[in-house]
Amino acid sequence: MTKNIAQAAVKFEQWQPKIEQESYLTINSLECHTGGEPLRIITSGFPVLKGNTILAKANDCKQNYDQLRRALMFEPRGHADMYGAIITDAERDDSHFGAVFIHNEGYSSMCGHAVIALTKTAVESGVVARTGDVTQVVIDVPCGQIYAMAYSHNNVVKHVSFQCVPSFVYAKDQQVEVDGIGMVQFDIAYGGAFYAYVQASSLGLSLVPEQQEKLIAYGRKIKQAIIPQFEINHPTTAELSFLYGVIFIDDSPNQDVHSRNVCIFADGELDRSPTGSGVSGRIALHHAKQQIVLNETITIESILASSFSVRAIETVCFAGFDAVIPEVTGDAYVCGKGQWFINAEDPLKYGFLLR
């Protein structure tokens, strides 16, 4: 009988696949969250993705290794709202590294919460050499090149700001009939991904944790109603021409912030953070509606009351669209390290989802 639990615990920790178990694949990760939204940074063990661009690398993953994406995002290693980033070689000579974003449905074009976590961990781990209290990190992502700044105190990154890609309004004051909901008014804006923006109060919704299931159900229905009726074409990159999610907007009970966001994206994922690409599209929308001016900072919070600050720092013309360059600020935290074993003999090796 085991008497010394401390010794037993050490032996548990020393478990390793046996030599004859060559069917094991080991993938390592750094576990983070930004405003409550998880980010699993895949650091090693994943096959090297091929392609000259990040979009090409994402396509290589989709075509050849999608089962590993499912294994890392789905239960039992993940859950229906899991999110990840696969670190890759940079696409451009002046970038530090690249990232392919993964989730429960597949792949995304931009992820602000991931950029914040990647920037913080890149500086604190020494992937990018610290240059004093402010360090620039340049990341290639599917929608383009992202410039981020890590602001440190006593060698600890306290917050991160990043400049998003040109963000613009794609369609204003649209409406669609949604089965079981009725007529829904919405705008579509792009902030690295296309979102439909909906006033929550117009549908009787409250942006609180107690309504998460209803928010997911409504977000899914609205997205599926919009997709067949509204064609979305990115002006320069066909692979970005899709509606990524629905963002519900409402006032916040916190008078110190501008408003609250809840983003339902991919296959019914609910973002715990305010959504970096989502607030980028929102600031473009507010600017187009003359509700804010350049360099006016607003703070947007999530369903958990975690917050991002965002402002439009510049106006640009992007492929015929009046666009702005958003600057988004937030913070992230490291909450663990992972070592994931994928055993070829396991009938559930590539995971499953019950929701």
Swiss-Prot record:
List the top taxonomic levels of the source: Bacteria, Pseudomonadati, Pseudomonadota, Gammaproteobacteria, Alteromonadales
Instruction: Extract the GO molecular function terms from the UniProt entry.
Output: 4-hydroxyproline epimerase activity; trans-L-3-hydroxyproline dehydratase activity
The protein's assembly and partners: Homodimer.
Species of the source: Colwellia psychrerythraea (strain 34H / ATCC BAA-681) (Vibrio psychroerythus)
- Active-site positions, per UniProt? C111 (proton acceptor)
Catalytic activity annotation = trans-3-hydroxy-L-proline = 1-pyrroline-2-carboxylate + H2O
Q: How does activity shift as pH rises or falls?
A: Optimum pH is 8.0-9.5.
Name used for this protein in its record: Trans-3-hydroxy-L-proline dehydratase
Function, in words: Catalyzes the dehydration of trans-3-hydroxy-L-proline (t3LHyp) to Delta(1)-pyrroline-2-carboxylate (Pyr2C). Together with LhpI, is involved in a metabolic pathway that converts t3LHyp to L-proline.
Alphabetically sorted, this entry's keywords are: Lyase
Name of the coding gene: lhpH
Q: Does the keyword Lyase apply?
A: yes
